[in-house]
């Protein structure tokens, strides 16, 4: 199954769908069995202020919703999403390609706990994250790994996110 936009094909794997983001024709590939963005990601993209020429990093980008939205809502120079789950990162890359944002948005597969080794120190002006809300062993854990990773501190903690952000943010 695939959609078509400006001569580009959206490659959709079984179970995936193409959702209209209601912003300048942007669409996002999602798989409800893995993870779909919520209103919190949209609110975050409305809240973040990125100035012209600034570089932004989204830690734990999932399907890439935040850097994709920010690329249209702000005047930032470049947006990068870091995602540990290869399937989610690949889905995000396909959304970036489908929307023609390859020059503005990169999706990198990697571990948040190693972000300062993946990227140059003090390289980013803004860092966003929509972190897991629940501590690892608290609350009902979703049996789907992708959803559990997004909602619980399974692969990283808030401390990991803050530590790596301090290393990657420019001093201002």
What are the roles of these predicted feature ranges?
Residues 1-16, 30:
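N-terminal auxiliary segments of SAM/dcSAM-dependent transferases
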Residues 15-17, 53, 122, 172:
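Glycine-centered loop/turn motifs
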Residues 19-32:
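Conserved class I S-adenosyl-L-methionine
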Residues 29-50:
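Conserved SAM-binding loop and adjacent beta-strand
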Residues 47-129, 134-140:
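Conserved SAM/SAH cofactor-binding pocket of Class I
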Residues 75-78, 167-172:
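Short, surface-exposed connector motifs at secondary-structure boundaries
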Residues 131-160, 164-170:
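Mobile active-site "lid"/loop adjacent to the S-adenosyl-L-methionine
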């Amino acid at each position: 199954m695939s959609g078509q936009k400006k001569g580009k094909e959206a490659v959709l794997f079984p179970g995936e769908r193409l959702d209209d983001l209601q912003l300048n024709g942007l669409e996002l590939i999602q798989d409800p069995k893995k993870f779909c963005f919520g209103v919190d990601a949209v609110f975050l993209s409305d809240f973040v202020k990125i100035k012209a020429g600034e570089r932004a990093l989204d830690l734990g980008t999932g399907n890439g919703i935040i850097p994709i939205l920010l690329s249209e809502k702000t005047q930032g120079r470049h947006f990068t999403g870091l995602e540990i789950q290869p399937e989610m990162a690949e889905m995000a890359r396909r959304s970036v390609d489908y929307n023609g944002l390859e020059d503005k948005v990169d999706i990198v597969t990697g571990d948040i706990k190693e972000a300062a080794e993946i990227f140059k120190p003090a390289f980013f002006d803004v860092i966003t994250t929509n972190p897991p809300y629940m501590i690892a062993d608290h609350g009902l854990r979703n049996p789907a790994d992708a959803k559990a990773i997004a909602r619980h501190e399974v692969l990283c903690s808030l401390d990991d996110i803050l530590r790596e952000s301090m290393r990657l943010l420019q001093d201002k």
